[in-house]
C-alpha cells in the first residue's frame, strides 16, 4: 500500500510540473476547418442501414450511398441474395428521356421511395420545368373564402418545379408514371382499426366523423356540408382532451381540429380510451424572440418545475357509435402518470392507408402502467370494461426511480413479458396474466435493453443486451436469443462490437448496424440461428484521404479505485509524440446517457474536430452516468445531481496524464452542452485549481428551474403526507451557489429562445459571477433554440478560440473576421 501511495504521489507531482512553463502553441484552425459538418457530409455518406421490409415476405430493400453515388438493393434473407433494385445507368437514361432534364447514374435525385404491393418501387423526381402550383392556388382560394384580404389587381398563378411520379415494376424493370392516390384521411384524425371512424379534438373537446366526411375534410376542411359529432362538452382550455403536456404555446387556436393526444382503440373499433388532462395549475414560462419583425415577440409555454403542482389526468373509455363514455378510476398516487399500453406496430402496417393506435389487450379490456410522481412505485394494471375495474397485476417498488419498457402479450393474452431492474440489473420476466411469475427469462448480472421480437410459433424471444461478455466494454450492445420455455441465452452477432439491430415482424431475421468508436460501420444480415452475412460497409475512403485517424479506446478507474470507466481519446491527426498537448474533457453527466461514444459517428464536431486545433480531447463515463450498466452504477448520483460525476472525470484525466507523456495535466479544459454545460461549469467551480478553462453551453445550471420530470426523476423529490394531503419538496445544490469559487476561465453560451433549458439558467450564473466580482465570458446566440441551429459553425470557432487562448496561449480572438467561415 505504501509503495502504491508513493507512486501515485510521484505521478500527480509530475502532472503538476508538466505545464508550468509551457510555451505558446499555434492553434491549427486550418486542419479543424477541413472537418466541418459540411465537409464531413461531402466525404461520408451512409453509415447505417434502414431495412424497408416487404409486406408479405421477409424481403427488404435499402439504399446505400458512397462516393460513387446511391445504390438501391433488395435482400432476400431466405436465399441470402442481394440484388440491385435498378440498373441505375438505364434508369437515369429513361428518366432523362421522360423529363427532358439530364441525369446520370451518380446524380439521380430520387426522393420518397416507397414499396407498393411488394411489386413496385415508387419514387419522385423533381425536375426543372415550371408548372402551376395547385396546392398554393387551393390555399389562396380557401383564404379568400375565409375572408382574408387578397392582393388587388390581376395576379399571376403561383408556379413551382414539376415533380414527376414514377413507378418501377420489379419483375419486368418497366418504368411508368403514376398518379398518386388521394389521401382518404386527414392528419388530425385518430382512425379506428376498421377505418370507419376518426376522432379528433376541437375547442378542447372530442368529436368524431365517419369515413365519408373524413374524405371530404381532406379536400376542404372548411366544407360547410361536413357532418361532425360532438362527444364531450365539458372540455375547456388547459382542461380537456388533447391537451399537450408540458409544451406548446398557450395562445394556440383551439377552434381548429387537432390530433387527440392519447387516443387508443379497441381491436374491434367499438371503444376507444382517451385522457382528459388538467393543466391549469402548470405555470407559464417565456422566451422573447428579439429577432421577430417588426417587434420582438413573447413566446409563452407551459413548463412545470420541480416541486410545483403537476397536471392531473383522467381516463375515459368511449363506446361507438353512440358516443357514451365512462370514467375509469386508475389513480393510485397523487400526481401520478399513466400510459395505456399499445399494441406494437408491425413493419407491414407501413403500407396501410392509415395507422390506428390499438390498445394492448382485447375487446374486453386493456393494460396500462402507472407510476408515482417520485417513480419509487410502479404498477402494471389490467382495466376490465365489463366490471369497471382496474386490477394491479405486478407492483414494482424501489428507493430510487423505476424505469420500464413496453409490455409484450403472448399466448393469446394469457401471458406477458415484463422488463424490470428489481434485482439491480435489467432482466426479462415471464408472467401469467393474473400476475403469477412463471420464470425469469434472463437473470444475469447484465443489462437487457429491450425486446426486439417474439416468435411464439418457434418459441423464442430476440432481445438486445450489453455487459454479458465480461471482457468487453460493457456498453457494447449485442443481439441475443432465449427460449420462452427458459434456458441459456445465445448471442447471435459478433464479439467486441456495438450492434444496433432491427428485427423482422416474425423475428426470423435481423439487420444489425455494427461498429465501434474505432471501427467503421458495417451492416449485417443476421439469422435467428446466428448465421451472418455482410451487406454493406461505410465508405470512409475520402475521410481517410483527408488525414482522418480513428480515436483510441481506453479504460481507467473511477475515484473509488474499483469501478471501471470507459472512454475514447481523440488526437490531432498531425499528432506529434514529442509534443505535450493540453487535454479537454467533453462531458455529459447522464443519467440517461454519457458523452462517451461507443459506436462510430460522423457527428464529430466537439470531439475529433476540436482535437485538430491542437488538443487531446477525451470522453469518459462516470458513476451515475449511463443506464446500460447496473442499477447501482446508474443511480449513483441520486440525491447529488450537481456533483456526482465530477470526481470521476477529474480522476480519469489524472490517470491519463500520468500514463501518457504527451498529455499536460496542468492544462485541463472541460466542455459540454445541456447537462454537459451544467457539469462543465460545476467542474470548474468545484475544482478551480484543476480545471483551467470551461466552455458551458445551454446548461441547466439551476435544476430548480429545469423541467420537473428530468430533475425530480434523477435527483429525487420528497413526498410529504400531512393531514391527508401529499406535497412534494425538492432541494438541490446549484451552480450559482458556488460561483465565487471561480479561478479559471469560463465562457457561458446559450440560445436566447431555448425553450428546453430556459436562458434563465445561464443568467442566474451570470448574476452570481458578477456579484462575486468575477471576470468571465458570455455568448448569446440570437434566435437559437437548445441545439444552436444554424449558428453551430460560428459557435465552434468561438469554442476553439477560447480553449486556444487559455490552454495553448494563442488564438484568433484578436481578429474580427472568422475567416474559416468565409472560406467554407
Where are these regions (language model features)?
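Sec-dependent signal peptide recognition
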Residues: 2-7
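Hydrophobic h-region of N-terminal signal peptides that target proteins for export
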Residues: 9-18
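Intrinsically disordered, low-complexity segments enriched in Ser/Pro/Gly/Ala and basic residues
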Residues: 15, 268, 723-726
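Beta-propeller folds
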Residues: 18-500, 506-521, 525-526, 813, ...
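Serine-hydrolase catalytic core recognition
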Residues: 51, 284, 355, 363, ...
Amino acid at each position: 500500500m505504501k509503495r502504491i501511495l508513493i507512486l501515485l504521489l510521484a505521478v500527480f507531482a509530475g502532472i503538476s510540473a508538466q505545464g508550468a512553463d509551457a510555451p505558446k502553441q499555434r492553434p491549427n484552425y486550418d486542419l479543424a476547418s477541413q472537418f466541418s459538418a459540411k465537409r464531413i457530409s461531402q466525404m461520408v455518406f451512409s453509415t447505417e442501414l434502414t431495412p424497408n421490409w416487404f409486406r408479405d415476405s421477409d424481403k427488404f430493400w435499402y439504399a446505400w450511398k458512397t462516393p460513387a453515388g446511391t445504390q438501391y438493393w433488395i435482400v432476400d434473407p431466405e436465399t441470402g441474395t442481394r440484388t440491385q433494385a435498378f440498373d441505375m445507368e438505364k434508369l437515369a437514361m429513361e428518366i432523362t428521356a421522360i423529363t427532358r432534364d439530364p441525369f446520370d447514374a451518380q446524380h439521380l435525385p430520387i426522393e420518397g421511395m416507397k414499396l407498393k404491393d411488394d411489386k413496385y418501387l415508387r419514387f419522385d423526381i423533381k425536375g426543372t420545368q415550371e408548372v402551376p402550383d395547385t396546392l398554393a392556388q387551393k390555399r389562396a382560394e380557401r383564404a379568400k373564402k375565409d375572408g382574408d384580404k387578397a392582393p388587388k389587381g390581376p395576379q399571376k398563378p403561383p408556379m413551382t418545379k414539376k415533380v414527376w411520379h414514377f413507378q418501377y415494376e420489379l419483375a419486368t424493370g418497366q418504368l411508368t408514371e403514376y398518379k398518386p392516390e388521394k389521401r382518404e384521411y386527414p392528419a388530425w384524425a385518430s382512425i379506428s382499426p376498421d377505418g370507419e371512424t376518426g376522432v379528433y379534438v376541437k375547442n378542447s373537446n372530442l368529436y368524431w366523423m365517419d369515413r365519408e366526411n373524413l374524405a371530404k375534410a381532406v379536400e376542404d376542411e372548411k366544407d360547410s356540408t361536413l357532418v361532425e359529432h360532438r362527444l364531450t362538452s365539458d372540455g375547456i382550455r388547459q382542461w380537456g382532451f388533447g391537451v399537450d403536456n408540458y409544451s406548446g404555446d398557450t395562445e394556440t387556436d383551439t377552434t381548429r381540429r387537432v390530433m387527440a393526444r392519447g387516443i387508443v382503440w379497441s381491436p374491434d373499433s367499438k371503444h376507444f380510451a382517451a385522457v382528459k388532462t388538467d393543466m391549469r395549475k402548470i405555470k407559464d414560462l417565456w422566451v422573447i424572440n428579439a429577432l421577430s419583425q417588426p417587434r420582438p415577440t413573447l413566446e409563452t409555454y407551459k413548463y412545470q418545475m420541480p416541486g410545483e403542482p403537476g397536471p392531473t389526468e383522467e381516463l375515459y373509455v368511449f363506446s361507438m357509435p353512440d358516443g357514451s363514455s365512462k370514467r375509469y378510476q386508475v389513480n393510485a398516487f397523487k400526481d401520478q402518470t399513466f400510459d395505456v399500453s399499445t399494441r406494437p406496430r408491425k413493419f407491414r402496417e407501413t403500407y396501410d392507408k392509415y395507422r390506428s393506435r390499438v390498445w394492448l389487450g382485447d375487446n374486453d379490456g386493456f393494460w396500462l402502467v402507472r407510476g408515482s410522481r417520485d417513480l419509487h412505485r410502479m404498477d402494471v394494471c389490467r382495466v376490465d370494461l365489463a366490471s369497471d375495474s382496474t386490477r394491479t397485476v405486478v407492483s414494482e417498488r424501489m428507493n430510487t426511480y423505476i424505469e420500464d419498457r413496453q409490455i409484450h402479450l403472448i399466448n393469446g393474452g394469457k401471458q406477458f413479458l415484463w422488463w424490470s431492474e428489481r434485482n439491480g440489473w435489467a432482466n426479462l420476466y415471464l408472467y401469467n396474466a393474473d400476475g403469477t411469475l412463471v420464470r425469469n427469462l434472463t437473470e444475469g448480472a447484465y443489462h437487457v435493453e429491450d425486446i426486439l421480437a417474439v416468435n411464439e410459433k418457434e418459441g423464442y424471444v430476440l432481445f438486445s443486451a450489453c455487459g454479458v461478455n465480461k471482457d468487453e466494454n460493457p456498453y457494447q450492445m449485442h443481439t441475443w436469443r432465449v427460449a420462452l420455455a427458459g434456458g441459456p441465452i445465445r448471442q447471435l452477432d459478433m464479439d467486441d462490437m456495438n450492434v444496433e439491430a432491427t428485427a423482422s415482424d416474425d423475428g426470423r431475421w435481423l439487420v444489425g448496424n455494427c461498429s465501434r468508436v474505432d471501427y467503421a460501420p458495417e451492416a449485417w444480415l443476421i439469422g435467428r440461428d446466428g448465421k451472418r452475412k455482410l451487406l454493406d460497409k461505410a465508405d470512409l475512403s475520402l475521410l481517410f484521404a483527408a488525414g482522418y485517424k480513428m480515436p483510441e479506446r481506453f479504460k481507467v478507474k473511477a475515484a473509488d479505485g474499483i469501478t471501471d470507466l470507459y472512454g475514447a481519446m481523440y488526437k490531432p491527426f498531425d499528432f506529434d509524440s514529442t509534443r505535450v498537448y493540453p487535454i479537454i474533457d467533453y462531458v455529459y453527466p447522464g443519467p440517461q446517457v454519457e458523452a462517451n461514444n461507443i459506436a462510430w459517428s460522423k457527428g464529430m464536431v466537439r470531439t475529433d474536430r476540436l482535437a485538430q486545433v491542437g488538443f487531446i480531447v477525451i470522453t469518459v463515463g462516470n458513476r451515475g452516468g449511463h443506464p446500460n450498466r447496473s442499477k447501482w452504477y446508474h443511480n449513483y448520483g441520486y440525491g447529488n445531481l450537481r456533483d456526482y460525476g465530477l470526481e470521476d472525470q477529474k480522476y480519469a484525466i489524472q490517470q491519463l496524464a500520468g500514463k501518457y507523456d504527451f498529455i499536460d495535466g496542468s492544462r485541463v479544459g472541460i466542455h459540454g452542452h445541456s447537462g454537459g454545460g451544467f457539469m462543465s461549469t460545476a467542474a470548474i467551480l468545484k475544482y478551480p485549481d484543476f480545471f483551467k478553462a470551461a466552455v458551458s453551453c445551454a446548461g441547466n445550471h439551476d435544476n430548480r428551474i429545469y423541467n420537473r420530470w428530468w430533475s425530480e426523476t434523477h435527483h429525487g423529490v420528497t413526498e410529504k403526507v400531512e393531514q391527508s394531503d401529499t406535497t412534494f419538496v425538492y432541494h438541490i445544490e446549484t451552480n450559482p451557489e458556488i460561483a465565487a469559487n471561480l479561478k479559471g476561465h469560463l465562457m457561458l453560451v446559450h440560445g436566447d429562445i431555448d425553450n428546453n433549458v430556459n436562458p434563465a439558467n445561464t443568467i442566474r450564473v451570470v448574476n452570481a459571477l458578477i456579484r462575486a466580482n468575477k471576470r468571465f465570458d458570455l455568448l448569446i446566440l440570437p434566435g437559437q433554440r437548445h441545439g444552436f441551429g444554424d449558428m453551430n459553425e460560428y459557435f465552434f470557432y468561438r469554442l476553439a478560440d477560447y480553449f486556444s487562448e487559455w490552454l495553448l496561449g494563442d488564438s484568433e480572438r484578436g481578429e474580427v473576421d472568422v475567416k474559416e467561415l468565409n472560406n467554407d
